[in-house]
Structures are given as structure tokens and as C-alpha cells.
Amino acid sequence: METRRKFLKKMAAAGASALVVPQLLASCGKEEETYEGAAGAANLLVPKGDAMRITGTFLDEISHDIPHQNWGEREWDRDFRYMKAIGIDTVILIRSGYRKFITYPSPYLLGQGCYMPSVDLVDMYLRLAEKYGMKFYFGLYDSGKYWDTHDMSHEVEHNRYVIDEVWRLYGEKYRSFGGWYISGEISRATRGAIGAFHAMGKQCKEVSGGLPTFISPWIDGKKAVSNAQNAVTADEHEREWDEIFDGIHDVVDACAFQDGHIDYDELDLFFSINKRLADKYGMKCWTNAESFDRDMPIRFPPIKFDKLRLKLEAAKRAGYDKAITFEFSHFMSPQSAYLQAGHLYDRYKEYFEIE
């Protein structure tokens, strides 16, 4: 049985702790305030803002290899606010469906055996784009047959129905419907690519009264192949994309090459080629600044800020027309499942001095 003296000693110790802990917490708070104040100055070793700003982002709701965040409209609304705060004015649905998973209740695709989605994401994105003064680009359907066969022509048949259907359901209804993303990703002279891009681009423009279209291929650099010796050379890249642009420039308005497959000291060389080719064919030259890190052994964390900065600086030097990213919600958003994404958002704001 506890004696009265032991009980009083315990009570005294508890009282002392009650006094000390708040003081410790208060002092920690002061240290944090001091640290935050110092960090807010963001004394960088490089000139601030000497790069292209990201003004567009893909929306990756039907993903190949990135975890789903399971957001509802409340989370998406908040994310559009975060985008707007750093100057994003364009959102691009990367694909409206992949194999059997789709983003809207498409009568045609449901008839082809696709699964019914629980919500109409296309309608939601268009409403949020209108709310925040953004333009929405619709990404076409990906049946997966191109990835299985490496023949792009398979994608034309399904999208012949999807394009007409989507314009009827949404394009005539929402002012925020601003264009089309032809979602097939290629890197080189892929079989059927020129014909497929031309057919789909032509139909998109005809049905919508000439709204803009774009593609986002990758550069077949050393990070895209298992053996760096097999990476595309600058001359090969220019020759093959000269041929592709020649065949599609009348129905594809812009090309946003993905920037993550080449090394950082190759950016200026390849970017200058891309801009020269785009200018030759009267196309807009965008960059798809990947905000995930291809240099890591896992797929895929948010990118280190300096790597993103180097790529955006190179895009500015090349005179590119627009910078978009793949993709804000996973890799730059303060509410991303990746903790590092919110820190990337903060570093980006510091660099461009965005309040």
C-alpha cells in the first residue's frame, strides 16, 4: 500500500512536469517561428524566376503505374485552388479511359465491355475548370492495343465514336472545354502513328469547330532504354520527328515533348531541335516538365526541385511557348499522398516568388 509521503512526492513531480512541458513546447514554437521566418527569405544561389512557369497540368485519373488517391469532388476542388494559386490555367485529362476503366459513363465504351465509373469525372473537371477560369483538354481513349501491338492504328476506331460522343455530351455544354489531347504516346517513327494522329486530330478539329489539339511524346533518350548505347541520337531524333510533323502539322497544333528521358546536360540540344521543328511546321512547342523523378530506384517519387528547375530553365532558353507538367496532383500538390509533393510546391513558389 502506498504511503502518504510517496503519494505526495509523485504529485509534486507531476506538478513540476505540468509546468515544464508547456514551457518546452512554447520554446519549441519560438524556435520554429524563427526558423520559418529565416526560411521565408529563401536565399537561393541561383537567380529567382529565370525559367518558364508551369501553366498546365495533366490530370491522371486513369493511370498506368501511379497509385490512385481516391479523391472526391471536395479534394479535387481544393487541388484546383492550389493549381490556380501558382498560375495554372490549363488542365488536361491524360486519357478518358484505359482498357476497361473509364472516366465518364460512355454509352459506346460501356457497350464495348468497359466498367461503369462511380462518378462522371469529365463533367466534374469541366465544372471545376469553369469555376476557376481554366481550359480543359479532353484526352482520348486508350484501348491498350497500341501497347500490346506497337501499332497506333488500332486506337482510331474506338476514338471515332468517343470523339463524337464527348463533344455531344460535354463540348456543346461547357465553355471550359478548350481542346483535345491525342493521348497515344510514342517516341520515334512508330507504326501507324502518323496516320492515326492525323485521323484523330482531324476529327477532333472538325467536330469542335477547330479547337486546338496536341500530343505529348517522349524522347527516346538514355533513361528510356535499357542500354544507354541504344539511345536516340540528336540527328535521328530530328530526322524522325521532321517526318512525323510533316504528316500531322495541319491537324495537330502543339507538341509537348516529355523531358524526363534525357540527361540534364542534353536538354539544350534536344530542346533546340524541338523548337526548330515546331517553328518549321507552324506548331506550338510546349514542354511536358515531368514533376516525378526518373532517377530513383522506385517508381515514382516527386522530383528534386533543382532537377525541375534545370528543365524549366532550359525550356525558357529554347523559347518554348508553354510549360505543362505530369503531373501536379500526385507530385506537386500540398494534399498529395506523397509528403515531398507539398515541399516541391513550396520550393516552386519560393523560386518564382509567388505569395
For each feature predicted by the language model, list its residue ranges:
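N-terminal export signals
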Residues: 8-27
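Catalytic domains of carbohydrate-active enzymes, especially glycoside hydrolases
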Residues: 74-99, 248-250, 254
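Aromatic-lined substrate-binding rim segments of carbohydrate-active enzymes
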Residues: 79-80, 92-142, 196-211
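An active-site-proximal structural segment forming one wall of the substrate-binding cleft
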Residues: 118-128, 151-177, 244
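Aromatic-lined carbohydrate-recognition surfaces of secreted/lumenal glycan-active proteins
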Residues: 137-148, 201-236, 257, 284-292
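Active-site groove signature of glycoside hydrolases
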Residues: 141-146, 165-192
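Aromatic- and acid-rich polysaccharide-binding/catalytic face
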Residues: 177-184, 237-266
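Substrate-binding cleft of secreted/luminal carbohydrate-active enzymes
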Residues: 259-263, 284-354
